[in-house]
Amino acid sequence: DKTADYPTGCPDNEYLLSAQNCSCTMDSEGKIQLVTEDIRNGNGRAIKSKLWSPNRVDKIDAPVNAIFWIMKDPTIPPVVKLKGAALASVMGATLATKTSTAERVAAGTDLNALRIVPYANPFRTYPLVNDYEKFKKLVEEKNVACYIVNTGDFMGTKVKPADTLGILETIVEGKASFEKWGNFDDIEIMYDWEGKTADFKPDLNNAEYKAALKSAMQNRVDAVKGFAEKKEGYDKLPDEALAAVQKLVDALS
């Protein structure tokens, strides 16, 4: 687990078994304390005891029935559900995130800048359509559900680990209640979950928010077009992929 999400003194850190890339300091009592934030060292990691989670199992006798695209797009609510195999797969192909401290990047790179990393795999050495078709098949033929989970912030409000864990548990336990989101035909939204820390309800009547969301979706349209144009079309996706994200932009017009 990344330790930067759990500040020094956080009760969750009582369950750490080992840590690396973390620094330490001496407190007023002369005791050595672990510094979990990325202050001196970057990309702190730890092995955490399974006892950290009160709701845990050692084995799951069930097939994979859901895909979660984990993003850090500030225009997307903490969780939405995608309908349709093409949309589900292309949103993975246009996965928006921020540069992780685990990555080696050029000097001067803005770590807070949003960028698209198809399927969160910067190391792919084959055409992007291969992954697109595989994920599409899971949804289309295996009836796998697809969600986007935003683990960054939503329009300035931090989505905390308690929110993400609560969202996952609510869905896994079959307690999730999704409903149609605005004018989107293929996106549903859930407003409540276990451990919710703030009001994350998006206001599509807010012109500023709607424009930001439309811009984020347009970025995905541009990305899909770019796949077809760059590297002599090596990463071109089927036309249905472009149509699926263009439909989202049109719904915000």
How would you label these PLM feature ranges?
Residues D38-S253:
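Conserved NTP phosphate-binding and transfer environment spanning the P-loop NTPase/kinase superfamily
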